[in-house]
């Protein structure tokens, strides 16, 4: 079969003009992208187009379908901003912790070469896949807890949390064992260089257990808590900074690239555990065991 000249050029240069080849190529792509060049230059234009289309569709459904828009009242705007800011500002600050901590890890790993940076990228992808269940748990658990907290059914809330921690322990143990057993096949799958397999093997053999514990703490810190919004996001911020920078700096100077990776995981685990203790103490002091809204408990339905 004769090769398409446009496909050959794509393999050689990575850039194909949409007019090259037959006209069916344009129909195999989204009509909105017709006329947009491929390659790095076209990617940013495609991203801009898709973002604009998504924003317009979102506004249409919010305004015309859900009818959630209204005229802005300057009289009530300042009060609404203050009320929203009490929760939104700590959340924004807490969410800045992960990119800042990861940037420091990348800066510490950069002196060890591009292969070391590539290994950290592989480890990050493996973590996202291996512990995907743990990272999805808060989003699945919060609606259940919110419904039962609203009904003052604390027994069911306690049962759900206990079952969650049991699942985390079992899932984390099995995942850590699988990482140990599959360390070499995974390294071959990602085509890691021989000198950088040491970092990946260290993660699979030691970092898996540390990250399982850290992921469990991540799930705990993501759970809602009345009266302690600022504390909750503060203790999410502290582990990513205090638990990253000193440990990564020491590990890089003493153990090289392996020390950077293990220092990050060990530091996050230690400081996150201390942050959980501080969060629990602050919650007991601020709220205790009473309902902050002074509601009467709703009897369970038969």
UniProtKB/Swiss-Prot annotation:
Any coiled-coil regions, as ranges: none
UniProt keyword terms in alphabetical order: Plasmid, Transport
Molecular functions (GO terms): antiporter activity; xenobiotic transmembrane transporter activity
Entry GO CC: plasma membrane
KW Nucleotide-binding (keyword) present: no
InterPro entries (UniProt xref): MATE_fam, MATE_MdtK
Function: May be a membrane-bound protein, possibly involved in IAA or IAA-Lysine transport.
Name of this chain's protein: Uncharacterized 21 kDa protein in iaaL 5'region
Organism in which the protein naturally occurs: Pseudomonas savastanoi
